[in-house]
UniProtKB/Swiss-Prot annotation:
The lineage of its organism: Bacteria, Pseudomonadati, Pseudomonadota, Gammaproteobacteria, Enterobacterales. This is Uroporphyrinogen decarboxylase. It is found in: Cytoplasm. Signal peptide: none annotated. GO terms for molecular function: uroporphyrinogen decarboxylase activity. SUPFAM superfamilies: UROD/MetE-like. Catalyzes the decarboxylation of four acetate groups of uroporphyrinogen-III to yield coproporphyrinogen-III. It catalyses: uroporphyrinogen III + 4 H(+) = coproporphyrinogen III + 4 CO2.
Length: 354
């Protein structure tokens, strides 16, 4: 494979020295970019965009042409795995993702296949290979998956949810069925991420978007336990380099110590967690990624720079910080504000790495 020209992101995740703090943005390939909207229109719909390796590659690279980001992230969706299990994923205007046949009981779980990532999810691996080729070693490529718990919420609820009553009913009334589903998902996600790594992903991230809706005990049993299983099963080296793994539970700030025990390399932080506090608690074990409130990008440039400076000072000197937003970038953020953010991270962080 091509020599990596900028490996700041990988080095920071492994708490190795860097010249400046690396930065990328969750959902950096997305609707805030006019060129993304044009490519998506060309594809016809969202899943067609995900399933076309050339177009998925194009949208992955778009933000890198605008901003000096330190990593590219595969353009895909967390729901590719449940889709490959045959649940019939479709998108409803204004409603988000839906499944035609949600999982309602243990019998439904038993029928679910564990998808072969090179077959049913081959389009994702094609995209990874295409992106790696086109990146020409400029920056590393991040692969990702949803966590078993987060994927299960969509599969059991039949789509997005605000109250999670359907999956919580299963969790409390039929825990065996839910554990069976989560176990199958953990196996599927492990295979899926390992296939992404073999195809060329140089780091991977597990997005546990809905872990924060659980009690502490339930989080340990129904979310973290299965993420830990995945971390244990991942290829941690490829192409002569370590492949770092980041866990991100939105709303999971109170569980950082337990998350750090999984053996992952880094933890993603949402904007509700104080990064100085997080570093005090787990900084000797893992790197930290985050954690500016994505809505800060609506603020005037001077205020964005001030916030970047505050977060950098909160983390302080030394290694192990990847700057990011605390969740995905909003679709109506001014393009130049994203540019101000990225530039400020590089310029203002240099003093912390001398």
């Amino acid at each position: 494979m091509t020599e990596l020209k900028n490996d700041r992101y990988l080095r920071a995740l492994l708490r190795q020295p860097v010249d400046v703090t690396p930065v990328w943005m969750m959902r950096q390939a997305g609707r805030y970019l006019p060129e993304y909207k044009a490519t998506r229109a060309q594809a016809g719909d969202f899943m067609s965009l995900c399933k076309n390796a050339e177009l998925a590659c194009e949208v992955t690279l778009q933000p890198l042409r605008r901003y000096p980001l330190d990593a590219a992230i595969l353009f895909s969706d967390i729901l590719t795995v449940p889709d490959a299990m045959g649940l019939g994923l479709y998108f409803e205007a204004g409603e988000g993702p839906r499944f035609t046949s949600p999982v309602t009981c243990k019998a439904d779980v038993d029928k679910l296949p564990i998808p072969d990532p090179e077959d049913e999810l081959g389009y994702v691996m094609n995209a990874v290979r295409t992106i790696r080729r086109e990146l020409k070693g400029e920056v590393p490529l991040i692969g990702f998956s949803g966590s078993p718990w987060t994927l299960a919420t969509y599969m059991v609820e039949g789509g997005s949810s605000k109250a999670f009553t359907v999956i919580k009913k299963m969790m409390y009334a039929d825990p065996q069925a839910l554990h069976a589903l989560l176990d199958k998902l953990a196996k599927s996600v492990t295979l899926y991420l390992n296939a992404q790594i073999k195809a060329g992903a140089q780091a991977v991230m597990i997005f546990d978007t809905w872990g924060g809706v659980l009690t502490g005990r339930d989080y340990q049993q129904f979310s973290l336990y299965y993420m830990h299983k995945i971390v244990d099963g991942l290829l941690r080296e490829n192409d002569g380099r370590r492949v770092p793994v980041t866990l991100f539970t939105k709303g999971g700030g109170q569980w950082l110590e337990a998350m750090a025990e999984t053996g992952c390399d880094a933890l993603g932080l949402d904007w509700t967690t104080d990064i100085a506090d997080a570093r005090r608690r787990v900084g000797n074990k893992v790197a930290l990624q985050g954690n500016m409130d994505p809505s800060m990008l609506y603020a005037p440039p001077a205020r964005i720079e001030e916030e970047v400076a505050t977060i950098l000072a909160g983390f302080g000197h030394g290694e192990g910080h990847v700057f990011n937003l605390g969740h995905g970038i909003h679709q109506d953020v001014p393009l130049e504000h994203a540019g101000v953010f990225v530039e400020a991270v590089h310029r203002l962080s240099e003093q912390y790495h001398r």
